[in-house]
Amino acid sequence: MTELIKKGSGAKEASQFLAQATTKHKNAALLNLSNDLLIHTATLLQENEKDILRAQQKGTPETMIDRLRLTEERIKEISEAVKQVVALKDPIGEVTNMWKNEAELTIGKTRVPLGVIGIIYESRPNVTVDASVLCFKTGNAVILRGGSDAIDSNKALMSVIQDSLEASGFPRSSVQLIEDTSRETARDMMRLNRFLDVLIPRGGARLIQTVLENATVPVIETGTGNCHIYVDKAAEKQMAIDILVNAKCSRPSVCNAAETLLIHRDVAEDYLPAMETALKEYDVELRADERAKGILQEAKAATESDWEDEFLDFILAIKVVDSAEEAIDHINKYGTKHSEAIISNDYATGQAFHQKVDAAAVYINASTRFTDGFAMGFGAEIGISTQKLHARGPMGLTELTSTKYIIFGDGQIRN
């Protein structure tokens, strides 16, 4: 708790400095950080290797180790991502609306930082940089608590970040890492209302549920991604195959990867064998309902938990449905309100799907893999919010701000 109090106090003080920082000063610091990450590549890889070896010794699946791994190319990508944030418009100070009321008061609404943001996340060291940079750009101080699997990588990255920001004239406490990865410290952080203005969890269902159950700090939920592809009877066969393979296989360990295929009965016998062939190239394990299992050559029987799970692996659940309505009902029952897709050339069916499916992002004839700040065209994001208050979908710079009203008068009093 001592570490939390010390770093919380430092973050609160730094947030006052950051709120007043100019865009020019912040951008200059971020450009320096981008360069410093490249300069320290060898050290970062050396520390990351400690985490990789520890994960391998524990028998961690390779798809999860991939989330943990840093390479020279990935560090270059992280460095470039910092530059891309520099290029993004700074929302702080933006006047979103201004008007005069009946009392001749001029009322303005402007964007301001949230204050101090706490982020609890799992074994993805790139999040350490992404979260730091996004919070910094928006004038927020941030306290990070990463998973124990990535502790050596995170400590090395934090050292580079803090040294770089300090050299640019910013407090080291602008960005901080909680090095104690115990569950007790994580729970204490969830109740750090004295210093934290908001808490953002990034990780699997268990982590997010733990935060929701224990936090007294306001939470923005970045949900798990039990994403579905529904192939309608009016779907083009090759398009459906291409989208399914991309959504499932391009990077199965991320939250916007597809986990379940729903397919209309009218095209199941024709489409499923070709889909199985395409998925076999990636050694995807298929878990199918009775009707789909009768069509596929190699598939295990799906259980109830298979409809609920976010596999984050080369595993796909498959169900044959009688109608688009059944597909929608299934998604709304088992989905996590993240990203859902329909493949159909029938306009009315596509419209009904996007109107009835409850999700942050709904796709018509496109892969769910596009639920990402950069892919959507507004830059880096802190996570994908699956709740409806404050932010929903990819959370970019604007979603890390609040608003303040500024009222100009010339002596008015209220009668």
Swiss-Prot record:
| Molecular function terms, GO-annotated | glutamate-5-semialdehyde dehydrogenase activity; NADP binding
Recorded source organism is Listeria monocytogenes serotype 4b (strain F2365)
Any one Pfam family match given in the protein's UniProt record, by short name: Aldedh
Described purpose of this protein according to its UniProt entry: Catalyzes the NADPH-dependent reduction of L-glutamate 5-phosphate into L-glutamate 5-semialdehyde and phosphate. The product spontaneously undergoes cyclization to form 1-pyrroline-5-carboxylate.
Q: Where are the transmembrane segments?
A: none
tRNA processing as a keyword of this entry, yes or no, is no
EC code: 1.2.1.41
The record's CDD domains line, in alphabetical order, gives: ALDH_F18-19_ProA-GPR
Q: Which reaction does it catalyse?
A: L-glutamate 5-semialdehyde + phosphate + NADP(+) = L-glutamyl 5-phosphate + NADPH + H(+)
Q: Name one GO cellular component term.
A: cytoplasm
- Report the SS bond pairs: none
What's the name of the protein? Gamma-glutamyl phosphate reductase
